[in-house]
Structure formats: structure tokens, C-alpha cells
């Protein structure tokens, strides 16, 4: 016979066992997809998540790697966004192939204290950026000088550098255009076409960025740097433009000099067969074909970089010229072509271009 104490404990044991069994059955039910009568093995296609690993040309990177994952041609085609496309508010001028190839690396010598501060600031920013991204210009003509070291530039590192550069370069034009817009409203007078060119510049830089992100997927580490960097740089540039817009334009002129130098280095590496194989066979994304009038679906990555470098060279000329002008009274010489002049004047193209900027005495203002 059962004792009274043992008899009282039996329901407790039974209840605990029943609850445990029910919990196990519930867990098993939740772990099994509803209305599923087949067993899924790790080797079956349904087991794997649809992350499309075949769309990337380079393998997975480490968590803190700044390299961008390059899409295969299939990945680029799948990422083309052709829905609800609108015409560009600032149509891109035609840049002939020979004029794009004739763009050179130049430097405007510093003349004033403001010039020196602007130039040194750019050099400091570049050195920090080079250190983080593992970038270095070869000191010799040997393209394999840094092969096997952290300074070797791969397709992923090149694209990271381009993406970060364009995310920064798109800020000054929009900030300067916004502040000049407010100034025009506040002072109840014309801006003399500075705003249009500045916003065109910002739009152009953003199109560079939108093109690059169709070619590769930045790492989360790169995205975090861009997120923080944009917040800091935008606010600092905003305050400095209020204080001294002339030297802010000089700063951007030197920034564009570095952009031209970077893209020229990239073009040099593209000229070496087998150096950047993923870029050699790549067809450009649809957004580039829609924006640059000379590009076609058959254009190469090199054709794209030639146009982007030409854009940066134009921004270099524009900002160095703006820094030479009277900020509140002079007109924008790039906005209007004056007929009947017997001397060259700035225009939207790159056929008549002064890389270090136009001096004020040479302009019809």
C-alpha cells in the first residue's frame, strides 16, 4: 500500500512529467514548418538562405575589413533599378573620349595663409584616410611594388576608396548651395547663378556614388565610417562656410585635386593586364548609361572612370575659380556663355579648362 505522504506526491510528479512532455512536443512542433511532410537536409536547396553568394566576385571578408564585395556581372544586372526613373535635373554635358584621356594631375600652389591651411587640411585628411584603407601610391614604376602587403590595392579596396571619396565630395556643393540660397532669400537679391552650379556639383558626386554602389556592396564597417564622417564633415563645413566661403572653395579645389590623382592612379592600374581582373571584364550598370550621354551598355569600367575623373577635374577648376572671385558680388562665369568675346571663357565642358582655376582678371564678370 502507498503511504499517505507518497500518495500526495504522485500528482506532482505526474504533472511535472506531463508538462515536460508537452513542452518537448510544442518545441518540436514549432521547429517543424507547418504542412511539411518532407525532411529537409543541410544539402538540400531549401535548407540554405537565398543570399545569392554567386553574385559576388570576391569571397567573404572579415568583420572589420573595409574592402567592398564586388558584384559579378550577374549581380550588377540584378541590381539595376530601372523602375520609375526620372530625367536628371542637371543633364550631364558631353565629354569626348580624347578630352577625358587628356585630363592631368595638377596642383595649385598655395599663395595665402588660407590656401596653406586649406591644403594642409586636405593632406591631413588624406593621410588618415590612406592609413585606414591601406592605400599608398607606388614610389617606383613597378605595379607590383606592394603586392602581398596591406598596401596592395585590390578591386574591393579600390571601390571602398571611391565610395568613401564620393560620399564626402557630395557634401560641399549641397551645403554651399543651401547657404547661398538662404542668403539670397535673406538679402532679397540674386545669387548670380552660383547656386545652380553648386547643386549640379553635388548631384554629380551623388551620381558617382550611386554608380559605385551598383558595382559593389560596402562592408558594415565602411558604412559606419561614412555615417559618422558625414555627420561630422557636414556640420564643420557648414560652420566654416558661414565664416569664410572663399577658403572653403579653395579647400574643395584641393579635395578635387586628390580625387583626380586617385582616379588617375586607378586608370594606371587598369592599364596593366591582369592587375584588376574583375574590373577588366565588367560592364557598367544601367544608372551610368542613363546619366553619361557617351556611355553605352557595352562601355567598359575604364570608360566610366575616365568620365568620373573628368567630372572631378571640372569640379577642381570650378572651386579654384570660385575661390578667386568676390563671393557676394561676382557672377558665376560657368553659368552663362557670353557671345562676341575674343578671349576664352569658362564653360560646362572640358575643352577649355584651367585646372588651377581662372584668375579674376581673365574673366568677363
Swiss-Prot record:
EC number: 1.-.-.-
Region: Disordered, residue numbers: 32-52, 345-365
Keyword Iron tagged: yes
Comp. bias regions, Low complexity: 32-46
Primary location recorded for the protein, binned into one broad class: mitochondrion
InterPro entries attached to this UniProt entry: AOX (IPR002680), AOX_sf (IPR038659)
Cofactor note: Binds 2 iron ions per subunit.
One Gene Ontology term of the molecular function aspect: alternative oxidase activity
Binding site for Fe cation 1: 166, 205, 208, 312
Intracellular or extracellular location(s): Mitochondrion inner membrane
Cofactor: Fe cation
CDD domains: AOX
Binding site for Fe cation 2: 205, 256, 312, 315
Top-rank taxon, per record: Eukaryota
Record-listed Fe cation binding positions: 166, 205, 208, 257, 312, 315
Record key words, sorted: Electron transport, Iron, Membrane, Metal-binding, Mitochondrion, Mitochondrion inner membrane, Oxidoreductase, Respiratory chain, Transit peptide, Transmembrane, Transmembrane helix, Transport
Topology in the lipid bilayer: Single-pass membrane protein
TM regions (residue ranges): 220-242
Any one GO biological process: alternative respiration
GO cellular component: mitochondrial inner membrane
Described function: Catalyzes cyanide-resistant oxygen consumption. May increase respiration when the cytochrome respiratory pathway is restricted, or in response to low temperatures.
Family: Belongs to the alternative oxidase family.
Name the UniProt record assigns to this protein: Alternative oxidase 2, mitochondrial
Organism of derivation: Candida albicans
